[in-house]
Amino acid sequence: MKEKFNEKVIPVILKFINTKAIQSIKNGMVTSMSPLIIGSIFLILSNFPVKAVVDVLESTGIKPVLDQVCGATFSISALIAVIGISYSYAKLENQEPLNCGIISLATFLILMPSSITTEGGEVVSGIINKTWTAGQGMIGAIIVGLIVPPIYCWFLKKNIRIKMPAGVPEGVTNAFSALIPAFVILTGAAVILLDSTQQVLKLFTKLFRHHFRK
């Protein structure tokens, strides 16, 4: 039984683990470890289990600084993930990875709800909501990070790009090469947003939660 399992199941699992999508998620999520670990340290210090220490931190004005560092690191976890996953995917495809990460970040921000309703019922628009740049937006970040890079890489592989003459710096060449795929991807995100009234990331999250509740 064990031999049959090793012969039939293990190769399938290994094949799945070694797919570009899974490798990209793994490598991309690892990039968020450093800021999250640092943020966790500041979180522990800010909520130290000794009241006397907390009182000193509050009286000296250090606690708000600790909270700021903690909030800043945890509040961008989804942004780090979408950049890291996209970067890793493009790198596996041997394409320029940084532009891919930036395009994915822009796509994520386009699809993210950009308005909130205050307790008084006032709608505030044109914001970057930290709720969705943190853990709640992680599912959306993973999905965007797996959809954008294949499209980006397809354009570059098909040589559908703006070509620059020889002698132009590599950074400039890469930037212009990414213009066409960036235009198509960001325009597509805008069309999706127009048709969904800013509920795209919420839909991703709800579908994921509904699936795993079954």
List each model region and its residues.
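Signature of multi-pass transmembrane helix bundles
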Residues: 1-37, 42-44, 54-58, 62-214
